[in-house]
Amino acid sequence: MHFREGALYMSVHISKKAELFYKALGDIWVAEQTWHGNPNIAAWICTQAAEKTMKGFLRCLNMDYDHGHKLTALLEEVESVYNVTAETKTYIIYLDDFDLSLRYKNMPNDPTPEDAKTAISRAKHIMEELGANPKISPYIDEAKEVHNKIIRASNEKYMN
């Protein structure tokens, strides 16, 4: 670990296949910190976590993927190689609706804190389901290990 006054820098290594899962975990962590005061930010960042999770899934299988932000388009790509549950499909569609309504004007949406909590739960569920695939789980485990190490180090640095 490398510290500079006012900032935390850690030298960590993470594989390319775990990288997007690591970023998705960071998004979920930020959403968990902000849902009560900034539910629109928390809900939107959960769409980012779902996007990174699905792209990470496809990356782990050495598949090319759409570089856009439409979750339902990514879902189609994931479904071409994996049987996604109906529940998870509805969660992805739910989050995709947040993404559109928060990105563009004149779309009806003003997420409540409860909506943000639901978005967090659904983003976590998507990662859990896709991470249950034995070809994917080692990379999610790696991402969780690095994420937790950084959170612990940050807490030690700034909470003591």
Q: What spans do the regions from the language model cover?
A:
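Terminal alpha-helical segments
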Residues: M1-N160
